[in-house]
A protein has these predicted regions:
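Sec-dependent signal peptide recognition
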Residues: 20-25
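Hydrophobic h-region of N-terminal signal peptides that target proteins for export
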Residues: 27-35
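Residues that mark the start of a beta-strand
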Residues: 42-44, 72
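Short hydrophobic segments within beta-strands
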Residues: 46-48, 170
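Conserved SGNH/GDSL esterase-like catalytic core that processes O-acyl groups on lipids
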Residues: 54-153, 157, 176
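Alpha-helical cap/lid subdomain in secreted, periplasmic
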Residues: 116-268, 289
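Conserved catalytic region of serine esterases and O-acyltransferases that act on ester linkages
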Residues: 232-324
Length: 324
């Protein structure tokens, strides 16, 4: 492990590369300050992760605003990155300030900032963040051995650069059950892997003394149970996970996912659920009263259930998967 170079400074011009950006940041931060003076809840958060965390910089601002909260949120992501990759990218940035492997997007007061490329040191030093979040990649999130030492080292480095920031861990979710040999096995596997994921994140959060867990995986599982999601061989049953799903029959006449189907990531409705969970956890508000519903959620009863599941997950509710 290389010693952390706390005196390292990013190229400010790279992040504030035009006056329009700087003016927008200044005006929005002034608005946040005024809101704080008026008693509104304010928060700045940086999400370090991959495609399982990246949607929040777009989906969370309208939910937070609807709850009367001021939000400055950014995402630093590399597709598919696990904690080991994040740590290795951090070490590389310590010796090469021009190494910028992360896509960086930010929304201040609901206004999106043009995306750029950064390294983690730049992302962490861009703002005096209130919260920094980390997560494990979904494909290994159920394996406790994959969290150490990389996640521990990463959290330690974050604390040295952002000593005032609270550290939160996003708990990820398990996939749709269509990758197993049959649907029944897939549903059983989903239940088992979800429990392993929850336990692995809890152990990691305790070990690094995280300030909290953002229980997104638990919220997804609660929604699956409470709807309830009823899977069929060619139907995802209303799950909030999955994109561009289509099914085809194989040579034996059995249904399978067609090429190009995404059975891992959140669908548009799932991104709304994620925004509810993050808002509830980070701001400490009851999102069951949230007046905003994302355009992707057309059924009021589903929207109400998502709000309830988000609130329950944040309050500590946890269930194994009973979907069939």
């Amino acid at each position: 492990m290389l010693p952390l170079q706390v005196d390292w400074r990013p190229d400010d011009f790279h992040l504030l590369r035009d006056m329009k950006f700087a003016a927008l940041v200044l005006s929005c931060l002034m608005a946040v300050t005024v809101s704080a003076d008026k008693g509104k809840k304010t928060l700045s958060a940086l999400a370090i992760g991959n495609s399982f965390s990246d949607p929040v910089w777009k989906s969370m601002p309208p939910v937070a605003a609807a709850m009367g909260c001021e939000l400055d949120i950014a995402s630093a992501m590399i597709g598919g990155a696990d904690l080991k990759k994040h740590w290795n990218k951090f070490l590389e940035a310590q010796t090469n300030a021009n190494y910028r492997p992360y896509s960086f997007h930010r929304s201040i007061c609901g206004k999106s900032i043009r995306g750029t490329k950064v390294n983690l040191i730049e992302a962490l030093m861009t703002n005096d963040w209130d919260v920094v979040t980390v997560q494990q990649a979904s494909h290994c999130s159920m394996l406790p051995r994959t969290y150490a030492p990389y996640g521990d080292d990463l959290v330690s480095a974050i604390r040295k650069i952002c000593p005032k920031a609270k550290i939160y861990v996003q708990e990820t979710w398990y996939y749709l059950p269509f990758g197993a040999k049959d649907l029944a096995s897939g549903v059983a596997q989903q239940r088992e892997e979800h429990d392993k994921i929850v336990n692995a994140y809890a152990d990691f959060a305790r070990r690094v003394s995280a300030d909290g867990i953002i229980p997104m995986g638990s919220a997804v599982q609660l929604f699956r149970n409470r709807l309830p999601v009823v899977y069929r061989e060619n139907d995802s049953g209303g799950d909030v996970v999955g994109n561009n799903l289509s099914f085809e029959k194989d040579e034996t006449g059995h249904w399978r996912l067609a090429k190009g189907s995404d059975f891992c990531h959140l669908g548009p409705e799932g991104e709304y659920l994620q925004a509810l969970v993050w808002t509830a956890k980070l701001f400490g508000v009851d999102v069951r009263e949230c007046p905003y519903v994302a355009p992707s959620v057309r059924d009021p009863s589903r929207a109400a259930l998502m709000k309830a599941c988000a609130a329950l997950a944040v309050m500590g509710g946890r269930e194994g998967n009973r979907a069939e």
